Structures are given as C-alpha cells and as structure tokens.
C-alpha cells in the first residue's frame, strides 16, 4: 500500500461503508466487522471471518458480553498487531502493547456508547436493549430499526473505521510499507 494519510482515511471510510453494508446484509455484528476489515484491508482471509458469528449480540446473543462489533474489531487488532509467534513465546511487554492497542477500541466504545456490552450499545442506539433469544423481543429489535443504517450497522461501521484509525495511529501501515 502506498502511504498517505489520505489513503488511510480512505481506508477507514471504506471500512465504515462495508461494515454498514455487511451488517444490513448478514445481521451479525461480529462477522460483519471482521469481514469489512478483511475486505477493506485486502487481508484475503476466509478464517477467522466465518468462525466469529457466535460473538454476535454480546456473545451468543446474550447481550451480556462485549458488543460483537467490538469483539470483531478486537480480534482483528490482535491478529494484526501481535508478533508472528505463538502466545507462549510473546514477551509480557509485547502482550501489553497489544492489550493497550485493543483497549483503544474499547475506550472509543465507552465514549461513544457509554459502555462495551451489547446491552449498553443497544440502549444507546435503540433507546433500550432487547433479549434476542425471545422471539417477540427479537421482532421488537427489528421493528426498532436494529438493522437500519443508523443503528447496529453504524456501530459495526464505526468499529471497523476505528480499527483502521487505531492501526494507522500505531504505525501499522507504515510498518507494512517498509
């Protein structure tokens, strides 16, 4: 990738746009975030993309865990920013560098949505949270616009955009230019 800040800004907007598009199409925040980033960054990954769907809706649709868009973004940051070695071989300093990078994404969720859980994000963007396991509640989520542009798709778009911005701020693209 040739590198200019404007190119990286273009990548963040592409990641946002793909995140919105994919969440509207697939109705899965974790999958859509990882796929948007894989496609925007030309990672060429099939795995782990197809294996993250269980993280959606606050992990297994419980609402209690991290927002799936946050989980998907955290996964990509960890995969791209970790040293090329097994966990057991990574030094404490290297692990804490990655923890710090991932925490930047969590802080953005806290600032924008008031927290990191699916419930908290739903409350912010939908005005209340929904039990996605209950058919009536799930229908209420859809009727409240859960899959419309300015709701969960925008959360996925923001997460994907923020990941690109965090990668840029941590010289990921500079390192790739060599």
Model-predicted segments: where are they?
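Short acidic alpha-helix initiation/capping motifs at coil-to-helix transition points
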Residues: 25-31
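Amphipathic alpha-helical interface segments
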Residues: 35-39, 73-77, 90-178
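C-terminal catalytic subdomain
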Residues: 71, 81-88
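Acidic-glycine-rich active-site phosphate/pyrophosphate-binding loop
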Residues: 3-9, 37-55, 131-136
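Polybasic, low-complexity association/targeting segments
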Residues: 1-25
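Conserved phosphate/anionic-ligand binding catalytic regions in large, soluble enzymes, centered on
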Residues: 61-75
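Short cysteine clusters
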Residues: 29, 67, 118
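A short glycine/serine-rich beta->alpha loop
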Residues: 16-24, 56-65, 92, 143-148
């Amino acid at each position: 990738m040739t590198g200019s800040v404007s190119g990286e800004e273009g990548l963040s907007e592409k990641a946002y746009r793909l995140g919105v598009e994919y969440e509207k199409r697939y109705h899965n925040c974790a999958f859509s975030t990882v796929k948007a980033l894989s496609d925007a960054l030309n990672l060429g990954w099939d795995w782990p993309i197809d294996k993250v769907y269980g993280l959606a809706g606050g992990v297994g649709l419980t609402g209690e865990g991290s927002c799936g868009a946050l989980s998907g973004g955290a996964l990509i940051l960890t995969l791209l920013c970790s040293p090329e070695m097994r966990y057991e071989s990574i030094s404490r300093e290297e692990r804490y560098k990655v923890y710090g990078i991932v925490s930047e994404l969590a802080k953005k969720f806290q600032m924008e949505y008031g927290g990191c859980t699916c419930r908290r994000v739903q409350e912010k963007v939908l005005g209340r949270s929904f039990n996605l396991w209950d058919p009536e509640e799930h229908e209420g989520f859809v009727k409240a616009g859960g899959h419309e542009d300015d709701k969960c798709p925008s959360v996925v778009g923001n997460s994907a955009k923020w990941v690109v911005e965090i990668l840029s701020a941590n010289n990921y693209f500079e390192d790739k230019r060599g």
